[in-house]
Design a protein with these regions (language model features):
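ATP-dependent carboxylate-amine ligase catalytic core
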Residues: 1-68, 151
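Acidic, Mg2+-coordinating active-site environments of NTP-dependent enzymes
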Residues: 45-169
């Protein structure tokens, strides 16, 4: 939690409109604790995997902990899910999350399920791809990061910005 508290206390100004932070966890309840401090309006669940099994003991505890973010969002909030991650898809489909704020999926290449990246091309100069929105709008993007594995992180950032009112351009 201190990794989130420091920038809030030291860097945020009264004019700050959007604050993005990573909520890391090593134990069940860690994300809930951070959510209780920052009261997020929207959230992104980027990955669920076998990290920190020594403290979580099983995958169900990791899933439960990551979805503490979903439990903390207010009515009208948006929750972005990585549609490429099987653990996230499984948990998001659970009946207990039917009443979750708006669910928005993003993924690397599966069109029609949310925001996705198509025509990914990697070169020595970087990576290019086209983002397609759920309503079919599309835009080509270039980044200096090399590797298709970086595309998913950029797609979620684009999805969040777009859903908050920015254009794809």
């Amino acid at each position: 939690p201190m990794g989130v508290v420091r920038p809030i206390r030291g860097s945020l100004k009264p004019t700050t409109e959007i604050f993005v932070c990573e909520m890391g966890a090593r134990h069940v309840g860690d994300i809930k604790e951070i959510c209780d401090m920052v009261h997020p309006e929207h959230g992104v669940i980027t990955s669920i995997g076998p990290q920190h099994l020594e403290t979580f003991f099983n995958m169900e505890n990791i899933q439960k902990t990551k979805f503490e973010l979903a439990d903390a969002l207010p009515e009208g909030g948006m929750l972005f899910f990585n549609g490429d991650n099987d653990y996230i898809q499984q948990q998001a489909a659970s009946p207990e999350y039917d009443q979750t704020p708006e669910k928005i999926f993003y993924n690397s290449e599966t069109e029609g399920t949310g925001y996705c990246a198509k025509d990914v091309k990697v070169s020595q100069l970087g990576t290019e791809f086209t983002v397609v929105t759920p309503d079919g709008e599309s835009e080509r993007f270039q980044m200096r990061l090399i590797g298709a594995h970086n595309v998913s992180n950029v797609v979620w950032a684009i999805a969040v910005a777009h859903k908050m009112g920015l254009t794809l351009q």
